[in-house]
Curated annotation (Swiss-Prot):
Pathway: Quinol/quinone metabolism; 1,4-dihydroxy-2-naphthoate biosynthesis; 1,4-dihydroxy-2-naphthoate from chorismate: step 2/7; Cofactor biosynthesis; phylloquinone biosynthesis. Gene3D superfamilies: 3.40.50.970, TPP-binding domain. HAMAP family: MenD (MF_01659). This is 2-succinyl-5-enolpyruvyl-6-hydroxy-3-cyclohexene-1-carboxylate synthase. Residues 170-193 are annotated as: Disordered. It comes from Parasynechococcus marenigrum (strain WH8102). Binds 1 thiamine pyrophosphate per subunit. Belongs to the TPP enzyme family. MenD subfamily. GO terms for biological process: menaquinone biosynthetic process; phylloquinone biosynthetic process. Homodimer.
Length: 545
């Protein structure tokens, strides 16, 4: 473990002192945070970018309960997260002692493993027992599948001895080792697909550990080159740039994608955020194979696919390489004029609107710059309107549980770990996690936040909801000045008045090299109408071929 996020508290004092000393020695990158909920999301962002667990330290009581939202997301997005929660010793439990609750039960349903220190306090445990506890926690964090682990650690007083005394166990002598092999039951043989048979690949959000991504991408390239199958890719699929077989604007023209009866579908990871794709998959008559990156739990709410959890790289390695050379199958859907249509209908001029932002941002941002999309309208808009440029960019979104809580903190964590980053978010998601701005004071993470301010929950405007109290019951607009709120945290920001100003505003924001905010005000009612109009035009568009 090389990163730790520390939250304030007295009962966690021994852990804080030890972390501080390790950081002073250069053995640990230490970040502090006053809000446990935000801190856990920050750590999850770091862990996702780095592909290894980041620890969060909290005191006892309600502090532990605040870890639950991030733990739920880590569980469902299969990312490692180590939660170190200080606790009272057993003698203070169930007797009315202050700040003493049943915190060992708060996170258990979503954790891969719950480890306990000695009930009478950690000081009573021999060093080897603590080493074994730490090793077991790390193993479960990175098991099959990865996920959150809680170590509930009782501490007896005195809590605040000299820092050197807290390290009397010589933690620095604990060897860093790779996670122990998982004890899960072995996988069955990888299902075989015939690359000479016409089929299609549907690539959903990538859910693996970062170090495994290159092998996944290479396997995808090899299968596509071997089979010639077209690729329906989510921007979150982390496909390699210029991946062959990509279909531009596929979500808008699924009705034109006609498979021969019995044609197979290779699905990678969970479903993209498209109800139209779900309906299309339900119309197919051929076998559907779903490959997950180590996730044994079901990822097919449609109940149509056979799932194999060994990962795409392992699946490709087990495919029959003796098939005769395949010619590229007949094109299943002619490349349409969607890109030209959207360029005409969404010019880079006039009032800011959400489809235009989703179309132009992938074109205007530097190609290698990663983007995080809030798990609401942005992730859906980029799928629909972003085109090939969105598919070929490394995009993140935390859709394990698809909550909007923790959006800013997650993006800060990504930027701290991997460098320059852009967050595209709505106003409610940003406001919900406004404490995330506090992380900008530590190390100046290079994060540019693009705030689509549509005065409330714009995603609900796209649903068939008819209510005279729509704003009050669903959109819930808030009377907050986001630029002023950011400025109160020392964050510079600008208002983007029109689409013509967007390129210069992006250039300014990216040049800051630290957290910055661009506010883009939109009209959610007008944008909902525009989306409907664009879909209708896409259905009537003539194909290029």
């Amino acid at each position: 473990m090389t990163r730790l996020v520390l939250c304030p508290g007295s009962r966690s004092g021994p852990l804080a002192a030890a972390a501080g000393l390790l950081a002073a020695r250069g053995d640990l990158a230490l970040t502090t945070a006053i809000d446990e909920r935000s801190a856990a999301f920050l750590a999850l962002g770091m862990a996702t970018a780095g592909g290894r667990a980041v620890a969060v330290v909290t005191t006892s009581g309600t502090a532990v309960a605040n870890l639950l939202p991030a733990a739920v997301e880590a569980d469902r997005s299969t990312q490692p997260l180590l939660l170190l929660t200080a606790d009272r010793p057993a003698r203070l439990k169930n007797c009315g002692a202050n700040q003493t609750v049943n915190q060992e039960q708060f996170l258990q349903p979503v954790c891969r493993w719950l480890g306990h220190g000695a009930p009478e306090g950690l000081a009573s445990q021999p060093p080897q027992a603590l080493f074994d506890l730490a090793h077991e926690a790390w193993r479960h964090c990175h098991g099959r599948p990865p996920g959150p682990v809680q170590l509930n650690l009782p501490f007896e007083e005195p809590l605040h001895g000299a820092p050197e005394d807290q390290l009397s166990l010589q933690v620095s002598g604990l060897q860093r080792s790779a996670p122990a092999p998982s004890s899960d039951s072995p996988l069955g043989a990888a299902p075989q697909l015939d690359p000479n048979q016409a089929g299609v690949v549907v690539a959903g959000p990538w859910r693996g550990l970062a170090p495994a991504l290159p092998a996944y991408q290479q396997a995808l390239l090899q299968w596509l080159a071997r089979s010639g199958w077209p690729l329906l890719a989510d921007p979150l699929a982390a496909i390699p740039a210029d991946c062959p077989g990509q279909l531009d604007g596929w979500e808008l023209q699924l009705d034109r994608l006609q498979l021969a009866p019995g044609s197979p579908v290779l699905r990678l990871g969970p479903l993209p955020a498209s109800r139209r794709l779900e309906a299309w998959l339900q119309r197919q008559t051929g076998p559907q194979l779903l490959i997950s990156e180590g996730e044994p739990r079901g990822l097919d709410p449609l109940g149509l696919a056979d799932q194999w959890s060994g990962g795409l790289a392992a699946w490709w390695a087990e495919q029959n390489q003796d098939f005769p050379g395949a010619s590229t199958p007949e094109q299943l859907m002619p490349q349409s004029g969607i890109a030209s249509l959207l360029r005409q209908r969404l010019p880079l001029q006039g009032a800011v609107n959400e489809p235009a932002l989703a179309h132009w941002l992938p074109l205007l941002l530097p190609p290698q710059l990663p983007v995080m999309l809030a798990a609401s309208s942005p992730v859906r808009d980029w799928l629909i309107w972003g085109g090939l440029q969105a598919q070929n960019r490394r995009c993140f979104s935390f859709r394990g549980a698809s909550g909007i809580d923790g959006t800013l903190s997650l993006a800060m964590g990504l930027a701290m770990e991997q460098g320059p980053m852009v967050l595209v978010t709505g106003d409610l998601a940003l406001l919900h996690d406004s404490n995330g701005w506090l992380h900008g004071a530590q190390g100046n993470p290079p994060l540019l936040v693009l705030l689509i301010d549509n005065q409330g929950g714009g995603i609900f405007q796209q649903l068939p909801i008819q209510s005279k109290q729509f704003d009050r019951l669903f959109a819930m607009p808030q009377r907050v000045n986001p630029l002023a709120l950011a400025a109160a945290h020392g964050i510079d920001g600008r208002q983007v008045a029109c689409l013509e100003d967007l390129p210069e505003a992006l250039e300014w924001g990216l040049a800051q090299g630290r957290p910055a905010l661009l506010r883009l005000a939109t009209d959610r009612e007008a944008d909902a109408r525009l989306r409907t109009q664009l879909r209708s035009a896409a259905q009537n568009a003539e194909p290029l071929l």
